[in-house]
Each structure stands twice: as structure tokens, then as C-alpha cells.
């Protein structure tokens, strides 16, 4: 009976070591995801409402086809990250320069995904009336995709002058204003909200960047 005791102790030790290793491994795996998941409830809803995961430092789900009915994974390569980092480096001097750099990153994204998705055929202000969902983004798609890009920029430490704001919405049927929504940046110094709105622009055109105060008055 005594001869059987040591193996039991070894087995217990192995079990404890395995459990500890599992906890450590889980912490390592969950750590970055938890950091990437630091989002407001409004931003979280952008993803949960269409059953997709938020972006991470390595990939994002690209929505198209109107309300994310079609989707494609963008796995960022080393070349992608280098290109985006170089674009954003030009915006370090000021908040205005950073917003201009973000515009260029969105154009980079449009060029990167256009031939893959077929959105290189897309038109400005596309919606169901165009009967061409497979080549287009609606404003929900552009809001999700642009917000995802902003979250990736934040994860990579490339946003110096701005935080990421909650999506903004507009639409007043009394004055025939079309319902619409957009991604938002918040100037850290002034707290002014700025939209980054790709939907009103065609393929490879820079997204609208303007204050929310102005944006809510436009059609």
C-alpha cells in the first residue's frame, strides 16, 4: 500500500501543475482580447447586433452587402501594419493632422478591400434602392468598418490626439432628412466630436470629416 502512495502524489502534482498552466495560458490568451474589448455599450452593440466579433490587433470583420449581410475577414499583414503606421505618422503633430491621416487610412482600407469584396464598384450613398448590395456598403456597414479601423489604430497606439466616440445618428422626417449614422472621433484636448463618414463618398474618395454639430444638420 505504501508503494502506491508516491504515484498518487505525482499524479496530484501533475494535476495541480496542469491546472496552473491552464490558468496562466488562459490569462495570456485572454489578456489582449480583454484590452481590445474596452468599448462603450454603443460600440459593443455595433458588433453584437449582427453577431460578429469586435476587431483585435490582428484582424477585423469587414461588413458589406447592407447591414453586414455579407462579411469578410481582414487579417492584417506586416505590410498592412507598416503602411497604416506610416500614414498615421504624418498626423502626430496636431489633432487636425491626425484627422487628415485617419482619412487616408480609410482610403487605404477602401483600396485594400475593394478588389476582394467587389466594393471597387461601389457608389456613394448606396442603399437598398440601388439593388446592388453585393458591391456596396450601406451606412451601417461604413459605420462598423470605420469604427473597427479606429479601434485597431487605438490598439496599435496610433491615435495620439483622439479617443473613439460613440456612433452618431441623424434623421428628421419632418424636414426630409435621410436617416444616417457614422463613426466618431473625439478630440482629447477640446472634447469636440468629429465624424469620419465614408458612406456619402464613392470608391477611393476621402470620407467626410467634420464636426458632429455640422454633420447633424446635413442631408
Regions found by a protein language model. Give the residues of each.
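N-terminal secretory signal peptides that target proteins for export/translocation
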Residues: 1-12
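Bacterial N-terminal signal peptides
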Residues: 18-28
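Short N-terminal segments immediately surrounding and downstream of signal-peptide cleavage
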Residues: 37-65
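Acidic/histidine-rich, surface-exposed loop or edge segments in extracytoplasmic proteins
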Residues: 64-96, 122-132
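Mid-length scaffold segments of soluble, non-membrane domains
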Residues: 98-162
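Hydrophobic/aromatic-rich core segments of domains that either
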Residues: 151-215
Amino acid at each position: 500500500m505504501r508503494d502506491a502512495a508516491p504515484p498518487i502524489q505525482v499524479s496530484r502534482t501533475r494535476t495541480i501543475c496542469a491546472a496552473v498552466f491552464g490558468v496562466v495560458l488562459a490569462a495570456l490568451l485572454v489578456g489582449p482580447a480583454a484590452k481590445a474589448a474596452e468599448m462603450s455599450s454603443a460600440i459593443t452593440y455595433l458588433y453584437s447586433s449582427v453577431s460578429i466579433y469586435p476587431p483585435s490587433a490582428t484582424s477585423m470583420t469587414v461588413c458589406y452587402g447592407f447591414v453586414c449581410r455579407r462579411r469578410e475577414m481582414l487579417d492584417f499583414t506586416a505590410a498592412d501594419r507598416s503602411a497604416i503606421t506610416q500614414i498615421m505618422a504624418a498626423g502626430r503633430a496636431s489633432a487636425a493632422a491626425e484627422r487628415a491621416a485617419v482619412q487616408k487610412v480609410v482610403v487605404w482600407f477602401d483600396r485594400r478591400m475593394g478588389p476582394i469584396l467587389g466594393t471597387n464598384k461601389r457608389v456613394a450613398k448606396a442603399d437598398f434602392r440601388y439593388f446592388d448590395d453585393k458591391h456596396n456598403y450601406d451606412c451601417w456597414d461604413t459605420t462598423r468598418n470605420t469604427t473597427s479601423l479606429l479601434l485597431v489604430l487605438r490598439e496599435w497606439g496610433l491615435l495620439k490626439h483622439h479617443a473613439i466616440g460613440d456612433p452618431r445618428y441623424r434623421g428628421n422626417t419632418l424636414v426630409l432628412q435621410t436617416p444616417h449614422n457614422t463613426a466618431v472621433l473625439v478630440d482629447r484636448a477640446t472634447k469636440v466630436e468629429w465624424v469620419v463618414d465614408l458612406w456619402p463618398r464613392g470608391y477611393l474618395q476621402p470620407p467626410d470629416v467634420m464636426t458632429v454639430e455640422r454633420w447633424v444638420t446635413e442631408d
